């Protein structure tokens, strides 16, 4: 091809390409920066918070902010319309007992709200949960699992050729859960060599991925499977996980709206009973119908999935390692004592007004729900984890959905081998480095070489 023709071709391709830049971040930012790099303090120590409002990293003058400060979920200092002449403000705070002191700052500029926060940890290693473990807790759950196993798994398996790679075969699978025809659906990813070579049967570690709250489709963990593991990513609602997103949106906003509140007056009626049993039956499926080696089995998830990770590890000793990330459903009853409680904050909103947490009437009329909550509290499952199960915990100090108070308290209850890796500035989401560390920990703990 002549040079002029080649240049013309390049110009044609360039013009034909859509010119669309990515949208990332904001020009305006609200920063709340503690004076300790690790965001940690001892009880009684004073934390200093430096607040900055910037546009393109340059301080904004005469900007108005509102702020709230104090123990997380119970902030007792609130100011509105504070003018920052040079774009900065300094606040101080301290705690007289272990916990998190949280500062929230927000401003509105050109009609848009911007916010920042900082949750400072005060002696978090001393935090202890409030929830009580019922005497029959483990017995109740083991009996429920035994009853469910009287129902055959009766599995189904459908190849998804459009998702398969040269290294991984991908299937949608389902199996019966707690009773006849109540099914759990998921995406199973199996190394292709496992099915091509019978000699490779029962040679692979396995990872069960459990979901966060909501209703959605799932793609399966092809990446981990490509490194030589069986992965099963499950949904919890008894419906296929390969339909169009609109189906799940309609179900979530209709038939399954607020499912986490269902049946809280009785431990046998809670929606989460079939969810937890379904997770254990997913492990049964892995054991009976995949080339799992019977030795290394991980379970992991975030938010609701973090709670389910704790439940699996606590109830099933086939689980050798678990990785809960900003685990929800931990220490439900903490708000009855004026302490930050785990999502979905059952008694923070639904008991007497949360502003009146010191009242002797706190929780009155909620006795049945309080008792049920103890059977569905991640803390009590964590108490069952033994010294042969390795754990990796991660969460953010700015999380306003799953308070770090509950995450630390749950971590402190575990007596087995464990690691903690907080990413302080995260809210209820992941940082890329956090995701990478989680992924690397799972592969290493499952003895998978990259």
Model-predicted regions and their roles:
Residues 35-39, 149-201:
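N-terminal cap/lid segment of alpha/beta-hydrolase-fold proteins
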Residues 365-382:
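Active-site nucleophile elbow and catalytic-triad environment of alpha/beta-hydrolase enzymes
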Residues 401-450:
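C-terminal catalytic histidine-bearing segment of alpha/beta-hydrolase fold enzymes
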Residues 22-30:
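Proline/serine/threonine-rich low-complexity linkers at boundaries of modular beta-sandwich domains
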